[in-house]
Curated annotation (Swiss-Prot):
<keyword id="KW-0689">Ribosomal protein</keyword>
<keyword id="KW-0699">rRNA-binding</keyword>
<comment type="function">
    <text>One of the primary rRNA binding proteins, it binds directly to 16S rRNA where it nucleates assembly of the body of the 30S subunit.</text>
</comment>
<dbReference type="InterPro" id="IPR036986">
    <property type="entry name" value="S4_RNA-bd_sf"/>
</dbReference>
<dbReference type="GO" id="GO:0015935">
    <property type="term" value="C:small ribosomal subunit"/>
</dbReference>
<comment type="function">
    <text>With S5 and S12 plays an important role in translational accuracy.</text>
</comment>
<dbReference type="InterPro" id="IPR001912">
    <property type="entry name" value="Ribosomal_uS4_N"/>
</dbReference>
<dbReference type="InterPro" id="IPR022801">
    <property type="entry name" value="Ribosomal_uS4"/>
</dbReference>
<dbReference type="Pfam" id="PF00163">
    <property type="entry name" value="Ribosomal_S4"/>
</dbReference>
<keyword id="KW-0934">Plastid</keyword>
<dbReference type="InterPro" id="IPR018079">
    <property type="entry name" value="Ribosomal_uS4_CS"/>
</dbReference>
<protein>
    <recommendedName>
        <fullName>Small ribosomal subunit protein uS4c</fullName>
    </recommendedName>
</protein>
<keyword id="KW-0694">RNA-binding</keyword>
<dbReference type="GO" id="GO:0042274">
    <property type="term" value="P:ribosomal small subunit biogenesis"/>
</dbReference>
<feature type="domain" description="S4 RNA-binding">
    <location>
        <begin position="89"/>
        <end position="150"/>
    </location>
</feature>
<dbReference type="InterPro" id="IPR005709">
    <property type="entry name" value="Ribosomal_uS4_bac-type"/>
</dbReference>
<keyword id="KW-0150">Chloroplast</keyword>
Length: 201
């Protein structure tokens, strides 16, 4: 299944706020109206919608998300918590959380077009897994910095999470540590996502 490129407002109207996909917000009460029209949700649908929220927020294909779930399942600790850490430490998401892009698709475009350096080297893989002490900067070129400055000049969409530090005058971000679950940028019940996939196998 390919990455979603359709109308973004349609998704947030059904699933709620997805800040990684769009800065727009669903109108208040739209979720309640949708729920009243559709009646009581089944447990399957509840788990499916949580999975879809995760997929659309981080801009993943179904295959990519399944791969992350499998990696998280083999790691020590809570599968759901590890899954969120893996997704939050992706380079495209780190750029978004630093405020260097207004959405995760926008951040992915910066990476694909080779505007971003990690520890002084160009990285053009949006799924690159960032680590503590990684330094994220832009190329020292006018066009690269102008693109980032456009995002920095726009109203900030959220507070900078504590696992990151950003120096706007230098266009430089620092990964201080692995993200704590309370700083994840999406309201999500990750256990329902894990349950969804466990019932598919």
């Amino acid at each position: 299944m390919s990455r979603y490129r359709g109308p973004r407002f349609k998704k947030i109207r059904r699933l709620g706020a997805l800040p990684g996909l769009t800065s727009k917000r669903p109108r208040s009460g739209s979720d309640l109206r949708n729920q009243s029209r559709s009646g009581k949700k089944s447990q399957y649908r509840i788990r499916l919608e949580e999975k879809q929220k995760l997929r659309f927020h981080y801009g993943l294909t179904e295959r990519q998300l399944l791969r992350y779930v499998r990696i998280a399942g083999k790691a020590k600790g809570s599968t759901g918590q590890v899954l969120l850490q893996l997704l939050e430490m992706r380079l495209d998401n780190i750029l978004f959380r630093l405020g260097m892009a207004s959405t995760i698709p926008g951040a992915r475009q910066l990476v694909n077009h080779r505007h971003i350096l990690v520890n002084g080297r160009i990285v053009d893989i949006p799924s690159y897994r960032c680590k503590p002490r990684d330094i994220i900067t832009t190329r020292d070129e006018q066009r690269s910095r102008a693109l980032i400055q456009n995002y920095l000049d726009s109203p900030s969409h959220e507070e900078l999470p504590k696992h990151l530090t950003f120096h706007p005058s230098q266009y430089k971000g620092l990964v201080n540590q692995i993200i704590d679950s309370k700083w994840v940028g999406l309201k999500i019940n990750e256990l329902l996502v894990v349950e969804y996939y466990s019932r598919q196998t």
